[in-house]
UniProtKB/Swiss-Prot annotation:
Organism: Homo sapiens
Segments of skewed composition (Low complexity): 236-261, 277-288
GO molecular function: integrin binding involved in cell-matrix adhesion
Keyword presence, Manganese: no
Protein name: Mucosal addressin cell adhesion molecule 1
Membrane topology: Single-pass type I membrane protein
Disulfide bridge map: 47-94, 51-98, 134-204
Membrane side Cytoplasmic: residue ranges: 339-382
Residue ranges, annotated region (5.5 X 8 AA tandem repeats of [PS]-P-D-T-T-S-[QP]-E): 228-271
Gene Ontology biological process terms, A to Z: cell adhesion; cell-matrix adhesion; heterotypic cell-cell adhesion; immune response; integrin-mediated signaling pathway; leukocyte tethering or rolling; positive regulation of leukocyte migration; positive regulation of lymphocyte migration
InterPro entries: Adhes-Ig-like (IPR015169), Ig-like_dom (IPR007110), Ig-like_dom_sf (IPR036179), Ig-like_fold (IPR013783), Ig_sub (IPR003599), MADCAM1 (IPR037413)
Length: 382
């Protein structure tokens, strides 16, 4: 009888254990105890409970936080956090019950801000600079375990760089209303000698490490070479061709025709006019200017205009025009007194009482001609 009672108790215990094994614990997605959500983003948390008698109830609850939007049905509850703010961070608890038994699962919701806004100071390094600073703007959280900085060269941390510790300050922009307060964190390093050759750039890397999440942003810091090294090739290479090439052709090609061509026609052509040009001027350019045979063969004015025309077509037109205008002006000045003289002689010829000098000489000429015919020319009266 005792043996039968023992079997009965064992059967009942096995039945109870079987029912308990059929009841599964709560299933939460995502399963991590800490869930990170970006500031302004949205996230869903789903909680499920399977129960044999289909009488399970599941519900999300918040602890001193804004819970969010919750949709629940039999054995399932979904929590949605939209446009997450810093106030949405906190603890969420999923509570489920089945057959008189209660289960719960806790989730820590963490809201972070880590935009790609890194600035460096100075913007570019020169070998010998003592320090460099890197600042991450509008970030949270600022715990050193969550936010860290590193100074890299060639993908590895710069050896010998000494970190001086982060500086945390609130952003200068004042929050309005329910806006969240964000921070800027600055890390400074004391730089070692960069060595030779100098690397082209250093990199500031900021890393945000949260449970189930790791983000990194990187900002380049160019390294300029010493200012004295690039100057010699830059100054010597362009100056040598610039100074020698333009000066030699300018002085040799332009100066001789400028001094010889315009001066002689200005002095000789208007004064002698066409009378003395054939006797004097052809010899003077031949004797003084032995380099140009064209000047000795041509006339005084044309001989000096021809070489200028060959070298400078624009300069040839100006002396020729001056010579022509001077000649026309001289003819006009000579025509006016000639006309007045001719007019005066004409009036004297028409006047009977004042015959012209040519008419008064006629009797003497005729008398002299008569004496010559008789052979008495040259005999003085005695």
């Amino acid at each position: 009888m005792d043996f039968g009672l023992a079997l009965l108790l064992a059967g009942l215990l096995g039945l109870l254990l079987g029912q308990s094994l059929q009841v599964k614990p709560l299933q939460v997605e995502p399963p991590e105890p800490v869930v990170a959500v970006a500031l302004g983003a949205s996230r869903q948390l789903t909680c499920r409970l399977a129960c044999a008698d289909r009488g399970a109830s599941v519900q999300w609850r918040g602890l001193d936080t804004s819970l969010g939007a919750v949709q629940s049905d039999t054995g399932r509850s979904v929590l949605t956090v939209r446009n997450a703010s810093l106030s949405a961070a906190g603890t969420r608890v999923c509570v489920g019950s089945c057959g008189g038994r209660t289960f719960q699962h806790t989730v820590q919701l963490l809201v972070y801000a880590f935009p790609d806004q890194l600035t460096v100071s100075p913007a570019a390094l020169v070998p010998g600079d003592p320090e460099v600073a890197c600042t991450a703007h509008k970030v949270t959280p600022v715990d050193p375990n969550a936010l860290s900085f590193s100074l890299l060269v060639g993908g590895q941390e710069l050896e010998g760089a000494q970190a001086l510790g982060p500086e945390v300050q609130e952003e200068e922009e004042e929050p309005q209303g329910d806006e969240d307060v964000l921070f800027r964190v600055t890390e400074r390093w004391r730089l070692p000698p960069l060595g030779t050759p100098v690397p082209p750039a250093l990199y500031c890397q900021a890393t945000m490490r949260l449970p189930g999440l790791e983000l990194s942003h990187r900002q380049a810091i160019p390294v300029l070479h010493s200012p004295t090294s690039p100057e010699p090739p830059d100054t010597t290479s362009p100056e040598s061709p610039d100074t020698t090439s333009p000066e030699s052709p300018d002085t040799t090609s332009q100066e001789p025709p400028d001094t010889t061509s315009p001066e002689p026609p200005d002095k000789t052509s208007p004064e002698p006019a066409p009378q003395q040009g054939s006797t004097h001027t052809p010899r003077s350019p031949g004797s003084t200017r032995t380099r140009r045979p064209e000047i000795s063969q041509a006339g005084p004015t044309q001989g000096e205009v021809i070489p200028t025309g060959s070298s400078k077509p624009a300069g040839d037109q100006l002396p020729a025009a001056l010579w022509t205008s001077s000649a026309v002006l001289g003819l006009l000045l000579l025509a006016l007194p000639t006309y007045h003289l001719w007019k005066r002689c004409r009036h004297l010829a028409e006047d009977d009482t004042h015959p012209p000098a040519s008419l008064r000489l006629l009797p003497q000429v005729s008398a002299w001609a008569g004496l010559r015919g008789t052979g008495q020319v040259g005999i003085s009266p005695s």
